[in-house]
């Protein structure tokens, strides 16, 4: 019988909030409870509001005086304070292992002999110059960001990533030994995924229903998705586009584009609305300009939605080209996106194959049980290694 692992789950965010890290913080905790052992959640921190307020103030001051960006989530001061907070939380308790998702502002200065497994969807080096918020940074923010990342990896018995893109950066940019990295795709953040039958029931109709999910119209490529909608009409395909999670800029409208600015998945009504939208759509379309992973692709796969996505960042870690989706180059415009969509929508066999492959991808690799099983095995490996070294 496998011994239960006592896991300290360390996170700045609230693990009970389904919105934290797009739902990933909550989902990982539940998966580890099912497959690894006893999970004790030690977050969130009690000074997060103060940190956010001070970060916004410093960011505004930096931009006003230097034109540069301050990275509030990469502060040596707050990293030390976070470490002290979690040291107090760990004191007097018995744990076998620390699991720390998105914790490069906790782990660097944490004083503990408990082995750490960290998880992130990117490194600081991968983010710098890739996301707008990580461009034109203050020299002090760059220095702090790289130091925190390096310290986190040094303290991690294993660093888990959802994509080869992120893992390669840890190895290339910070010298992390490859054998101490692991690549496990993250699951779909769905409390009640649809059954296979429900996901595969929808047939191709006369109208191509496109769905875009994202909070940032510009970064998610909303303009390209709208152009694709217009180009589909020129190709003779009746189509609609439903945008969920953000608002287009003022004046950006189309009679066949609907906008749902926000869905609260913490509430049953919100989860039902989200479910209905995915069940009634034909394709997920996300011409993202920058992306570390993309839970939405896993969620789309659960509903049998073939995803059209940009070949950038960590997206290939969740969208396998020709399997559960199609990857288009960053340079592709609305016409190229429309042609790719039209090719699959116009062919019954291709359409149904895409739905089947998407659902299979969810069942085989893009669900939290698959992630939890692999991560639990990794935890047992780490504990066995430490036991053989006499460090436990």
Model regions: which residues?
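Carbohydrate-associated surface elements
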Residues: 165, 187
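Membrane-proximal helix-turn-helix segments that form the acceptor-binding/catalytic region
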Residues: 138-159
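Aromatic "clamp/platform" in nucleotide-sugar-dependent glycosyltransferases that forms part
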Residues: 289
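A short, well-ordered alpha-helix in the C-terminal region of glycosyltransferases
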Residues: 350-365, 374
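Short hydrophobic beta-strand element within catalytic cores of glycosyltransferases
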Residues: 306-310, 319
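Nucleotide-activated donor-binding/catalytic signature segment of Leloir-type glycosyltransferases, i.e.
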Residues: 245-283
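Conserved donor-binding/catalytic core segment of Leloir-type glycosyltransferases
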Residues: 160, 197-220, 226-230, 241
